[in-house]
A protein has these predicted regions:
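Beta-sheet entry/capping signal
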Residues: 285, 405-412
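Long hydrophobic segments that form regular secondary structure
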Residues: 399, 403-404
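Surface-exposed loop/interface segments of Gram-negative outer-membrane beta-barrel transport/assembly proteins
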Residues: 201-257, 298-304, 308-393, 409-462
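Short, small/polar-rich motifs associated with maturation and membrane association
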Residues: 1-311, 316-317, 322-329, 393
Length: 462
């Protein structure tokens, strides 16, 4: 049985392994474990935040251990541009977020999960579009052109939107010039360092599967005229007619009419699944994951879907004097929905006396003849806009300790992005807003690619 030294409480999740072999297990909720070992074997007990213990197998009696806190391990280590440093020794302005704070969120990407986590860092959405991007400001708006921070994923320039929050080990935000000095002018807007999860050496293979679901909805809608109120208002002020009873002198409209907010807004569902497999041997560690996200927009006919694959491994040789590793992320996103800056304004202003459907019009949509606005649902339906983006991130490194304290690191990074855009416009008649007598189809694609090669020397001797 494994217990905590000060409280004598059982410790679950402690890794127990036979030294020099791949045999291992993990303690249960009661701190108990079972492992096959021969007399003379050494059992190693290890877990985060506790001092590692080694015990020799001398007989068939149970081996009980009491683990003490490792104060050095518990002192937070912060990643900065030119290495790592204990937080107590840090002079620069750095904000950090741990995996514990990010796990369990139904967030589409790491930028969304970062909202409200670090003081002084602003994270906002440019629109309510589920396919829209997030804007992150680390140092405020200091430039008229570009205030975006530089994103570094596992040591190479990357893209925060392609990282699944469940795959993140930590996020460090470098706010001042000293912490981000190694990146030069590219770090004018700050630096966001993302470290993805790794396996652990001498750890048995572990499988984690998570499933999340959530909802998004509009908690309150605006109060607008119903059909009868709109008709009475229009007739009283002698507004131009729309053919549905709002014109001066026409028969008043009777009833509620169309609630366009109810037609266009919905309770949107979000589904997310993630599976991670990790482990390690005596000389290395590995971690890989797959994830899927399906996110509906609050606005009808808007959806976002994404697939993520991540691979990461690290291996050491010659008593850890040579280390090699790689990190790869493949991200596929699919988005649909025709949204512009006036979409919500159109929903609030479109007359409630106009029905959603009218079979006498081309396309079967209800129209207005006295307002230059489209039927909101018709506009979202006849304009079918879709995007599909594939992003590939690959980073490989080699690190060698030349002499004690002096390390050379070679880093190679590749980023590639391919986007396909498709826009289809169906036949419609939307009154004074306009009509389309024959369908239109437009397609285009673009490809973007970048390479980075870095060589660094780091000397650390205390």
């Amino acid at each position: 049985m494994v217990t905590e030294a000060t409280t004598n409480e059982p410790l679950p999740g402690v890794t127990v392994r036979v030294k020099g072999k791949d045999t291992g297990t993990v303690t249960d909720m009661d701190g108990k474990y079972s492992i096959k070992a021969n007399k003379g074997n050494i059992l190693i007990f290890s877990t985060i935040g506790m001092k590692q213990i080694e015990k020799a197998v001398t007989s068939g009696t149970p081996i009980n251990v009491s683990m003490e806190e490792d104060n050095i391990a518990l002192e937070q280590v912060v990643v900065i541009g030119y290495g790592t440093v204990k937080k107590s020794h840090l002079s620069g302005a750095v904000g950090s977020v741990s995996a514990k704070e990010l796990n369990g969120q139904v967030a589409s990407n790491a930028a969304t999960a970062l909202q409200g986590k670090i003081p002084g860092v602003s994270v906002a959405s440019s629109s309510g579009d589920p396919n829209g991007s997030m804007t992150i400001n680390v140092r405020g708006i200091s430039s008229l052109s570009n205030n975006n921070p530089l994103y570094v994923v596992d040591g190479a320039f990357g893209d925060i939107s392609m990282v699944d929050p469940n795959d993140i080990s930590s996020i460090e935000v470098l706010k001042d010039a000293a912490a981000a000095a190694i990146y030069g002018s590219r770090a004018a807007g700050g630096v966001v360092l993302i470290t993805t999860k790794s396996g652990r050496k001498d750890m048995p293979t572990k499988l984690d599967v998570n499933f999340f679901t959530g909802i998004s909805q509009t908690p309150k809608t605006l109060k607008v005229f119903n059909g009868e109120e709109y008709s009475r208002f229009a007739r009283y002020y002698k507004l131009a007619g729309d053919g549905y009873g709002a014109e001066n002198g026409a028969t008043p409209f009777i009833g509620e009419g169309t609630d366009w907010q109810d037609v266009m807004l919905r309770t949107a569902m979000t589904y997310k699944a993630n599976a991670t497999i990790s482990g390690g041997s005596k000389s290395g560690s590995y971690s890989s994951s797959v994830s899927y996200l399906n996110k509906e927009g609050i606005l009808r006919n808007t959806d976002h879907e994404s697939y993520n694959i991540r691979l990461k491994s690290d291996y050491s040789f010659f008593d850890n004097r040579l280390t090699i590793g790689e990190s790869m992320i493949v991200n596929l996103t699919k988005g649909s929905g025709y949204i512009h800056q006036d979409t919500m304004f159109d929903i609030f202003q479109f007359p409630s006396v106009v029905p959603v459907y009218d079979p006498t019009n081309a396309g079967g949509w209800g129209t207005s003849n006295d307002i230059n606005l489209p039927n909101p649902l018709a506009e979202m339906t006849v304009n079918d806009e879709r995007t599909e983006t594939t992003k590939i991130f690959l980073n490989a490194y080699l690190q060698a300790e030349i002499i004690k304290g002096l390390k050379y690191k070679l880093n190679v990074g590749i980023r590639k992005e391919h986007t396909k855009w498709r826009y289809y416009k169906d036949v419609y008649d939307l009154g004074t807003f306009g009509k389309n007598d024959k369908p239109d189809l437009e397609e285009k694609s673009s490809t973007w690619e970048s390479w980075v090669l870095e060589n660094t020397l780091n000397y650390d001797r205390t």
